[in-house]
Amino acid sequence: MQIDVDPQEDPQNAPDVNYVVENPTLDLEQYAASYSGLMRIERLQFIADRCPPLRVEALKMALSFVQRTFNVDMYEEIHRKLSEATRELQNAPDAIPESGVEPPPLDTAWVEATRKKALLKLEKLDTDLKNYKGNSIKESIRRGHDDLGDHYLDCGDLSNALKCYSRARDYCTSAKHVINMCLNVIKVSVYLQNWSHVLSYVSKAESTPEIAEQRGERDSQTQAILTKLKCAAGLAELAARKYKQAAKCFLLASFDHCDFPELLSPSNVAVYGGLCALATFDRQELQRNVISSSSFKLFLELEPQVRDIIFKFYESKYASCLKMLDEMKDNLLLDMYLAPHVRTLYTQIRNRALIQYFSPYVSADMHKMAAAFNTTVAALEDELTQLILEGLINARIDSHSKILYARDVDQRSTTFEKSLLMGKEFQRRAKAMILRAAVLRNQIHVKSPPREGSQGELTPANSQSRMSTNM
């Protein structure tokens, strides 16, 4: 008996959130420069929480970036974290006295001044919106809601920002306005990690005439919008652990129009799309949709390590492929959207490699197989046992000789079983056709009961029939 288990629903593949990265190879300045706004600050905070060696540097950078906004609460929170991280660094047994270890003092003057500015701007925007509503000018009201949403977003009040952007929907007078509203809601929903909301508004934006009715060549603006929508949908599918669907979304992104640092960078598209494709695509899909894709090749040029991993996997050089995956694992664990899925994706990629390696053979020497996967025979045997139990490999293991044998399928019995099933299906269809012919010949009419709440003549709940026989 074989057990068919969906690896994405396997409880063993639950996301691992308790991880610490001790040996990062990340260039923090270059990484932060790829993002803007709240996304940059949140990613730096995520790195600070998961990587002790980069904690102080990441928090200092986040502190300087947050001072360009009205987000006073986040400034105070980051400053508190930075003070704690600095004290931990100073109290460490192997701490080396350095200059500049002390965190900058809390800028109370900036805090007070920024709070006042934010309040004054909020009052002005609120007054303007009331005036627009008094004049009943839809376009002005829509812009007023958008401006108010932008201000709340700058202050870090995401729930109110979402409300303001959503309210603009009632005042949209064109498809362009609807798309702009959807993009604003999607952006805030990504920050809130409300993924069902993201997919809902991606669908709304794609159904607007400006996007849905265009075929063939799209103009630059439409292509940019579509790329943004596909990337947002990809993030949502990734969060839902629907990796194949996420890969398809990222593969539809256009490199020339991928410019929205408030959500993600082109490098993210390459990494997310590449790893999800490796974990879920078969050999033909990988060749057709990734390796031969002229558009996605441009993304992979930004991440040569991911590109090399994909090519090594396709060329069946699994030891090199898995070694390169391990080398970049620490950096992937510092990505706030990919980190919870790294273990699951790596497991699925390795399982797919094992399945692909064994598929052409009737038997395989597990010693050679272990060498190809850079592992021990005992560890390989455990992996293969799990794959057999899950029904992913139809084989049996000779533990004494350390040989993996493919199970022989009795083609004769299989053919007979298929023939019997087809015969039963033909009988069922023939009986249905004879019954239909008899009904038509005898002019039998069956009235269905009326639907609840429908108007017209009332008929009994049971179907009525009448038969007229031509003599």
UniProtKB/Swiss-Prot annotation:
Residues modified as Phosphothreonine: T459
Cystine bridges: none
Residue ranges with Polar residues bias: 456-471
Comment, domains: The PCI domain is necessary and sufficient for the interactions with other CSN subunits of the complex. Mediates the interaction with CAPN8.
Function noted in UniProt: Essential component of the COP9 signalosome complex (CSN), a complex involved in various cellular and developmental processes. The CSN complex is an essential regulator of the ubiquitin (Ubl) conjugation pathway by mediating the deneddylation of the cullin subunits of SCF-type E3 ligase complexes, leading to decrease the Ubl ligase activity of SCF-type complexes such as SCF, CSA or DDB2. The complex is also involved in phosphorylation of p53/TP53, c-jun/JUN, IkappaBalpha/NFKBIA, ITPK1 and IRF8/ICSBP, possibly via its association with CK2 and PKD kinases.
Quaternary structure, from the entry: Component of the CSN complex, composed of COPS1/GPS1, COPS2, COPS3, COPS4, COPS5, COPS6, COPS7 (COPS7A or COPS7B), COPS8 and COPS9. In the complex, it probably interacts directly with COPS2, COPS3, COPS4 and COPS5. Interacts directly with inositol kinase ITPK1. Interacts with CAPN8. Interacts with USP48. Interacts with ASB4; this interaction negatively regulates GPS1.
Modified residues (Phosphoserine): S448, S454, S463
Family: Belongs to the CSN1 family.
PROSITE patterns named among the record's database cross-references: PCI (PS50250)
GO cellular component entries: COP9 signalosome; cytoplasm
Pfam family, one: RPN7
Native species: Mus musculus
Stretches assigned to the PCI domain: 249-411
Stated name of the protein: COP9 signalosome complex subunit 1
Keyword set, alphabetical order: Cytoplasm, Nucleus, Phosphoprotein, Signalosome
Coiled coil: none
Transmembrane segments: none
Chief location: cytoplasm
Region described as Disordered: spans on this chain: 445-471
Stored InterPro entries: CSN1_C, PCI_dom, Rpn7/CSN1, Rpn7_N, WH_DNA-bd_sf
Subcellular location: Cytoplasm; Nucleus
Expression tissues: Expressed in the base region of the oxyntic and pyloric mucosae.
